[in-house]
Amino acid sequence: MTIAVGRAPSRGWFDVLDDWLKRDRFVFVGWSGILLFPCAFLALGGWLTGTTFVTSWYTHGLASSYLEGANFLTVAVSSPADSMGHSLLLLWGPEAQGDLTRWFQLGGLWPFVALHGAFGLIGFMLRQFEIARLVGIRPYNALAFSAPIAVFVSVFLMYPLGQSSWFFAPSFGVAAIFRFLLFLQGFHNWTLNPFHMMGVAGVLGGALLCAIHGATVENTLFEDGEGANTFRAFNPTQSEETYSMVTANRFWSQIFGIAFSNKRWLHFFMLFVPVTGLWMSAVGIVGLALNLRAYDFVSQELRAAEDPEFETFYTKNILLNEGIRAWMAPQDQPHEKFVFPEEVLPRGNAL
């Protein structure tokens, strides 16, 4: 027997910190937690502060806080004024100059919440990568979570960066998001954009697949227990499978004539559909940031302008979009002092 005698390698501060971050505890921290927890705390705290106390009078001419009488559906952390451009509006920057009240008035909370929120979401994705590596599984959860991150970054950051200022980004609130949706439709005809169509197909298709999958598994359970209902019938730690893939395959083969042949392909498809849809919608929003057009059926517009009896759903939607632009712009951008004479407002079938 050989005995090797030597000195244990010294552990530096990095090794000690690595052990502490990855220690098994109720809430795992990890290296990703250094980014996730502070950013998530500051983003959520900034949003709660803004919706509780901070007005949007100086940026949008609106009341947007509980203090002013708004409710949960109408409060918001509003985007900065158009005149601020793409400034980060740092508290110590030239705009606020360290004055917290002035910073609130200028809309400084919006870039604060947007940037910390984006980095918080990225930190959560990295958390899934990190834990997957430690547990020894594939990182597809992190890959899936990249889709909502792409949508958030494209809508809240890429779109306003392509426009004249942060003002045109959605404010952080329920009714504020609805206003932004109307804006996208009126100024970009977003619902006719093929990337939006792919996004809708992905989200609704993912919901459909989720419902079908859950129902099929429930339908093909073959090992029941003594519980009064499905939710009480199983031991949550049982190792064996309790539903029949073969029976499910036979059922859907009779319904559609085709069915998934194995679970890997089935679950990959359930991952692929919503993730691809969200990614495509994010690509479409980046296109809107650059003011790219999708489908413009000019021939129908010209014919509708010449022939009062010719109208399609497309030309009708174009008129509705013109109405949104004409009536929304003065309300949405009061600082521009838009005035639309009566004769230029859309009326009837005339484009």
UniProtKB/Swiss-Prot annotation:
UniProt keywords, alphabetically: Chlorophyll, Chromophore, Electron transport, Iron, Magnesium, Membrane, Metal-binding, Oxidoreductase, Photosynthesis, Photosystem II, Thylakoid, Transmembrane, Transmembrane helix, Transport
Gene3D superfamilies: Photosystem II protein D1-like
Topology versus the membrane: Multi-pass membrane protein
GO molecular function (one): iron ion binding
EC number(s) stated in the UniProt entry for this protein: 1.10.3.9
Binding positions for a plastoquinone per the UniProt entry: 213, 260
Catalytic reaction equation(s): 2 a plastoquinone + 4 hnu + 2 H2O = 2 a plastoquinol + O2
Binding site for Fe cation: 213, 267
SUPFAM superfamilies referenced in this protein's UniProt entry, alphabetically: Bacterial photosystem II reaction centre, L and M subunits
One Pfam family recorded for the sequence: Photo_RC
Sequence positions that bind chlorophyll a ChlzD2: 116
Entry-linked PROSITE patterns: REACTION_CENTER
Compartments it resides in: Cellular thylakoid membrane
Superkingdom to which the source organism belongs: Bacteria
TM annotation in the entry: 39-59, 123-139, 151-164, 206-226, 277-293
Binding site for chlorophyll a PD2: 196
GO cellular component: photosystem II; plasma membrane-derived thylakoid membrane
Listed GO biological process terms: photosynthetic electron transport in photosystem II
Annotated InterPro entries: D1/D2, Photo_II_D1/D2_sf, Photo_RC_L/M, Photo_RC_L/M_CS, PSII_PsbD/D2
Functional description taken from the UniProt entry: Photosystem II (PSII) is a light-driven water:plastoquinone oxidoreductase that uses light energy to abstract electrons from H(2)O, generating O(2) and a proton gradient subsequently used for ATP formation. It consists of a core antenna complex that captures photons, and an electron transfer chain that converts photonic excitation into a charge separation. The D1/D2 (PsbA/PsbD) reaction center heterodimer binds P680, the primary electron donor of PSII as well as several subsequent electron acceptors. D2 is needed for assembly of a stable PSII complex.
General remark: 2 of the reaction center chlorophylls (ChlD1 and ChlD2) are entirely coordinated by water.
Family per record: Belongs to the reaction center PufL/M/PsbA/D family.
Name the UniProt record assigns to this protein: Photosystem II D2 protein
